[in-house]
UniProtKB/Swiss-Prot annotation:
Protein name: NAD(P)H-quinone oxidoreductase subunit 6, chloroplastic
Bilayer disposition of the protein: Multi-pass membrane protein
Keywords: Chloroplast, Membrane, NAD, NADP, Plastid, Plastoquinone, Quinone, Thylakoid, Translocase, Transmembrane, Transmembrane helix, Transport
Any Pfam family: Oxidored_q3
This protein's GO CC annotations: chloroplast thylakoid membrane
Assembly and interaction partners: NDH is composed of at least 16 different subunits, 5 of which are encoded in the nucleus.
Catalysis performed (reactions): a plastoquinone + NADH + (n+1) H(+)(in) = a plastoquinol + NAD(+) + n H(+)(out); a plastoquinone + NADPH + (n+1) H(+)(in) = a plastoquinol + NADP(+) + n H(+)(out)
Superkingdom of the organism of origin: Eukaryota
EC numbers on record: 7.1.1.-
Localization terms from the record: Plastid, Chloroplast thylakoid membrane
One GO molecular-function entry: NADH dehydrogenase (ubiquinone) activity
Family statement: Belongs to the complex I subunit 6 family.
């Protein structure tokens, strides 16, 4: 269905503002459960951006993997840990916070510079010089993504699964450790 470009620009504007507000909610809220819910909102906005770009498979994978698995895992881990919340909204900045802010800002600006100065269309056409633009559009994207994941990007794909497994084991370990400490304190006071 062909819609006017202003319609796409309006939806894009709403999605980008949702991304910015959701990201600010993740960073600024002191309640970790609310931050995790805002993170899920950010993931949904990203998947809607993929739908806007006609990347249906990537949008579905974004919803299933990030919202359905990673964000739910984060919420369950946070609820199992059950840490006390900070009552003060404004926490004091330390030197480490300033160093982290400087480092993250410089990495963001460096990546922004590289991304904006790279001609992406030339890179894709240089890697596949015998493809015509009509042939590029007709490539089955799901099959292409699957073959690239299992051939060219097999090692990063497996490393990502190992990182997610370590995060899951770490969340379970933290939840069990908190429970053991509570039980030991209760046993101590019973004597």
């Amino acid at each position: 269905m062909k819609l006017p470009e202003s319609f796409y620009e309006t939806i894009f504007l709403f999605l980008e503002s949702g991304l910015i507000l959701g990201s600010l909610g993740v960073i600024l809220l002191t309640n970790i459960v609310y931050s995790a819910l805002f993170l899920g909102f950010v993931f949904v906005c990203i998947s809607l951006l993929y739908l806007l770009l006609n990347a249906d498979f990537v949008a579905a994978a974004q919803i299933l993997i990030y919202v359905g698995a990673v964000n739910v895992l984060i919420i369950f881990a946070v609820m199992l840990i059950n840490k006390k919340q900070y009552s003060n909204f404004f926490v004091y900045w330390t030197i480490g916070d300033g160093i982290t802010l400087t480092l993250c800002t410089s990495i963001f600006l460096l990546l922004n510079n590289f991304i904006s100065n790279t001609s992406w269309s030339k890179i894709f056409l240089m890697t596949k010089p015998n493809l015509v633009v009509k042939d590029i559009i007709l490539i089955n994207t799901v099959r292409h993504i699957g073959s690239e994941l299992l051939t060219e990007f097999l090692l990063p794909f497996e490393l990502m699964s190992i990182i997610l497994l370590v995060a899951l084991i770490g969340a379970i370990t933290l939840a069990r450790r908190e429970k053991k400490i509570e039980l030991e304190k209760n046993d101590f006071f019973n004597f």
